Structure formats: C-alpha cells, structure tokens
A protein has these predicted regions:
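Solvent-exposed loop/turn and edge beta-strand elements of beta-rich ligand-binding domains
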Residues: 1-239
C-alpha cells in the first residue's frame, strides 16, 4: 500500500473563473474528489466524483479527469407583517447587520411581498427596523443565525399597531394650581363614550390606550381617528 485510504493527497482552491486543477503525480489506483468548503454564501456540495487512475496501457501517459460541482446559494426570506403575521406591510425601512455591526443590506418593505437575500454567509445577524409604516410601532431587533443549508431560511418581524393616550392637565385659570375631581368623557366621532377620566390631586388624568388610525384590508394606513374630550363635571367651586 503506497497511499493509505482516505488520505488527502492534494487540496486546491477555485479561481475567479470557478475552476481549479490538481497537478499531483499520483500512483496508479482509485481516487475520489470532493468539495470540503464552499465559497461564502453558498452550500457545500455533497457530491463525490470517483477517479479511475488505474493502468491503461503504455501509450497513455496522462490521465485527465474533469468534475463539475454546483453550489446552491444560501437564501434568507424576510417577512415584515402586522401582529397577526398574515399581512406583509409596506413602508417599513429595514436593515440587516452582521455580527461586526456592518450593514449587509437595507430596503423598504412592499405590500404583499417578502424580501429575499441570497448568498448570505453563515453567521449571526440582526434584523433592524429603522422606521415603521405610519400607524405602527417600531419593532424590537430580531437576531437570527444563518446556517449552511439549501433550504430557504425564514426570518419574521411583526409590527404592533400604534396606540396613544389622551392626557389632561387641569389647572385654575387664575392661580395655576391643579384642580382635582374634574370629570371628562372621551368620545368617538359618533358621540359614543369610550372612556371617563377624573383628575387627581395634581390635576392629571389620562385615558386608556386608544387606536390612532384605521387600516385597509392589506394592513396599510387608511385614515386618522379623531376623538372629542368633553368636561362633564366641574370641581366644587368651579363652573
């Protein structure tokens, strides 16, 4: 036995043209060629090509062998939806950042469409929302890890609908001192009472969380919501 089985005889790296050549002077025998590392952003091929380098007669001085390896690109599909996870939201400005803090890619989300990034090297990344669509809260960062697989890797980020509060500070017109016990009603455009507020000793009152706008069926902004605040009971000694 001249060469022990499974001994690595030669290792080479492809050039810009995707080609590589082995030039070792091999003893006669059986060999195989396989890929041991794929380019960054690609999946390593699992193909193994057998090479028959047995004696083929005294007229054959050089045995040539060609093998073609194909590498599938690593793909990451990024979904930007509302909290239900059913509607792809437009208008979100998103970025993917690598483990060193370097910007990899940035884009603006589109209605009904996910975003695909191809040839993303294996490693850890952060999906960041730079600004949310109107009517939505900016989501927290999402960290994810890209693995070496030909399957599409999916990353999702969800936006909650934006809400607001009505804040009241009630003071004496003359003295500027806070007034306690004043009652207010928060009403919608149809006059329906949505909340009742009473000022505390600091003259402060605030409503529950209220939606700030309505949305179309695809989750996009439709129109702002307007509320009316009506004082229904004054404090003792006030009109």
């Amino acid at each position: 036995v001249i060469v022990k089985a499974d001994t690595q005889i030669e290792r080479t790296v492809t050039g810009k043209d995707g080609k590589a050549a082995f030039t070792s002077d091999l003893p006669l025998g059986q060999y195989y060629v396989k890929e041991i590392e794929a380019p960054k952003g690609y999946v390593k091929s699992d193909k193994i090509f057998d090479v028959d380098a047995s004696y083929q007669g005294d007229k054959v001085k050089v045995i040539e062998f060609k093998a073609a390896f194909e590498n599938a690109p690593i793909k990451v599909e990024i979904s930007k939806t509302d909290i239900t996870g059913e509607k792809e939201l437009p208008g979100a400005k998103l970025s993917v950042i690598d483990a060193d803090g370097k910007l990899v890619e940035s884009w603006t989300s589109e209605a009904g469409k996910t975003h695909m990034i191809e040839r993303l090297p294996v490693g850890k990344y952060t999906l960041r929302e730079e600004s949310a669509p109107y009517g939505y809260k900016v989501a927290s960062d999402v960290t994810f890890e890209v693995k070496e697989t030909a399957e599409i890797q999916k990353v999702s980020m969800k936006d909650e609908q934006a809400v607001g509060k009505i804040v009241i500070e009630k003071t004496d017109k003359v003295t500027g001192k806070p007034i306690e016990g004043v009652v207010f009603e928060v009403r919608d455009k149809d006059g329906k009472v949505l909340d009742i507020l009473t000022t505390d000793k600091n003259g402060h009152a605030e409503s529950k969380e209220l939606p700030i706008c309505t949305y179309n069926e695809d989750g996009t902004f439709k129109e702002d919501i307007h509320y009316t605040v009506v004082e229904t009971k004054a404090a003792d000694g006030y009109i």
